Amino acid sequence: MKTAKTQPDDRAARVALCKVGEPMDPTIATLVQERGTVGAWRAIATNADGAYDRFAARVSDLDLARVLHAADRLGIRVLVPGDPGWPRGLDDLELAPLCLWVRGCVDLAAVLARSVSVVGARLATAYGESVAGEIAHDLAVRRFAVVSGGAYGIDTAAHRGALAGDGVTIAAMAGGVDRLYPAGNHDLLEEIARTGAVVSECPPGASPQRHRFLARNRLIAAMTPGTVVVEAGIRSGSLNTARNAERLHRVVAAVPGPVTSTASVGTNELIRQGIASLVTDAAECAELFGELGADLAPRVEGAPAVGDDLPEVPRRVLEALPVRRSSTVDQLTRSAGLSVGDVLGGLGALEMRGLAARSPDGWRRAG
């Protein structure tokens, strides 16, 4: 590295460590904790006793000024802890990212203060994509930013739904923000970068790899106050996101699916284990993730049944009245467990309401 002998500041040291290491690297994390970012970088760059040989090739190739210049040319900015736009939720992670690479002009800290992560299976069903899109759209209308991972399936539906609701959506990448992945979502991710943000802890040029996806999932969980899993099989990576959210004491929700669908086994299990609250729409998500008492979902109630508003005696007489045949007053006293006077009074009230009718053989329900 051409700048190995310089004395970098915290920001430069974080960028350098990010370039030579991997997300959640335990060696770098320990060094930063013990020596600070500048001391950690100095130890790795000098490699005095050969303890950090595994970083040597990347250290040798690193030209920090060139990295930062290339990022600036591509419209990529670097956020570090303490910056005004730094997502404060990331500080809750045991292995927090050294820095965040961002394409997009939104103030991340501001939009993430009222946000929801919407995640789920890549191989989603039509049901899952429809529900994810509708939830994300309606959350955006309610001024929630929607965070997801940019993948096919539920992630795509969530991003598109938020955009359709004229909202802000943020895509967290498992590779560099200059290598938008998957390729089939390139145009969508470009639109997200223009209107919201595409973010990653991996530096520009980094390719998406499996371990980076797992590391990325913890960012999705940490950045927002809550995560909703729309559809997930039993081995879906979105379950990893949900469990990260639970460990971080974030609110977790899941949309139930058909018990016959393998695509919903994971979400149903999250609900069964008590990890996730059951939600069915954006209103219920907003109630969970929004300000206490400010985003209440309407109660779901069925249509009132005939006679629900009646006093007790007429209601008991109505319940005792047959539908297809008539009944005498004596029979009604036995069926309803009431006196003759109560039955006659109840029948009179029901007749006035059009709920009971006289017949040659006694009384029956009207209609």
Which ranges hold each PLM region?
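Short, small/acidic-rich helices and loops at N termini and domain boundaries
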Residues: M1-P87, R353-G362, A366-G367
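Glycine-biased, small-residue-rich flexible motifs in mid-sequence functional cores and linkers
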Residues: M1-D9, L74, V78-G367
